[in-house]
Amino acid sequence: MLSRLLKCKIHRAVVTHAELHYEGSCAIDGVLMDLAGIREYEEIHVWNVTNGKRFTTYAIRGEDNSGIISVNGGAAHQADVGDLVIIATFGDFTEAEANVHKPRLVYANPDNTVNHTANCIPVQVA
C-alpha cells in the first residue's frame, strides 16, 4: 500500500500577480521551484493564508530570482496580490520510502526570496 505524504512546500509566499485571462496555472519563481523540488506542470495545492481559500492547479516556471508568484486563470478569483499563500505538493510512497521520507520545505521572505529551508516541521505545542 502507498501512503500519500507531503513532498514539498513553499511557506508564506506572497502573491505578486493574479492574471484572470492568462492560461491557467501558477507561475512560481524558478529558484523557489528548484529548492522545493516542484516540477513544471506538477499538480500543486495552494492554501491562501489571507482569505482561507484552497485550490489545486499546476506549476509553471517563473523567471529565476524574480520573486513571481502569479495565480492565473480561474484560480485568480481565489487570491489577490499581496495575499500570503502556502504552495504544496504530495507524493505517493511505499512503506519503506515513507519511513525515511523528509519533505523539502522552503520558507519565503515577504519579497519571495528564500528565508531558510528545512526538512521537518517543528513540533506544535499547546
UniProtKB/Swiss-Prot annotation:
Principal subcellular localisation of the protein: cytoplasm
Entry's cofactor comment: Binds 1 pyruvoyl group covalently per subunit.
GO cellular component assignments: cytosol
Residues holding substrate: 57, 73-75
Pathways involved: Cofactor biosynthesis; (R)-pantothenate biosynthesis; beta-alanine from L-aspartate: step 1/1
A single BP term in Gene Ontology: alanine biosynthetic process
Cellular compartments annotated: Cytoplasm
Keyword Ribosomal protein: no
UniProt cofactor(s): pyruvate
Keywords: Autocatalytic cleavage, Cytoplasm, Decarboxylase, Lyase, Pantothenate biosynthesis, Pyruvate, Schiff base, Zymogen
InterPro entries: Asp_de-COase-like_dom_sf, Asp_decarbox
Reaction(s) catalysed (UniProt annotation): L-aspartate + H(+) = beta-alanine + CO2
EC numbers on record: 4.1.1.11
An example molecular function term from Gene Ontology annotations: aspartate 1-decarboxylase activity
Active site residues per record: 25 (schiff-base intermediate with substrate), 58 (proton donor)
Residue numbers of Pyruvic acid (Ser) PTMs: 25
Changes after translation: Is synthesized initially as an inactive proenzyme, which is activated by self-cleavage at a specific serine bond to produce a beta-subunit with a hydroxyl group at its C-terminus and an alpha-subunit with a pyruvoyl group at its N-terminus.
Described function: Catalyzes the pyruvoyl-dependent decarboxylation of aspartate to produce beta-alanine.
Subunit structure: Heterooctamer of four alpha and four beta subunits.
Family: Belongs to the PanD family.
Protein name: Aspartate 1-decarboxylase
Source organism (scientific name): Acinetobacter baumannii (strain AYE)
Gene: panD
